Amino acid sequence: MRIKVDEKSDALYIRLDESPIVESEEIQPGIILDYNDKNQAVGIEILGIKKRIPLEELKKLQFETI
């Protein structure tokens, strides 16, 4: 899994899987899911991230491997 914050685009992208993306669907305004050819979600894009989560809070994210 990879997480990318693009400050210029004001977007957060979470890549769950490296399989090719064949379809994308906006499930809510500004939230887009990417799917592979097996209809599995492989990516999540959140637009307008600065309005949803303050940038300073994003920088504090902690990750846990389970």
Indicate where each model-derived feature is located.
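C-terminal structural segments of small proteins and small subunits
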Residues: 38-65
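Structured beta-strand/loop patches that form or line metal/cofactor-binding pockets in enzymes
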Residues: 2-3, 7, 12-26
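Short connector loops at helix/strand junctions that flank enzyme active sites
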Residues: 9, 28, 56-58
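Hydrophobic/aromatic beta-strand elements that line small-molecule binding cavities or substrate pockets
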Residues: 30-33
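Short, acidic, Ser/Thr-enriched surface-loop or helix-capping motifs
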Residues: 7, 35-36
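Short low-complexity stretches enriched in small and charged residues
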Residues: 1-4, 44-46
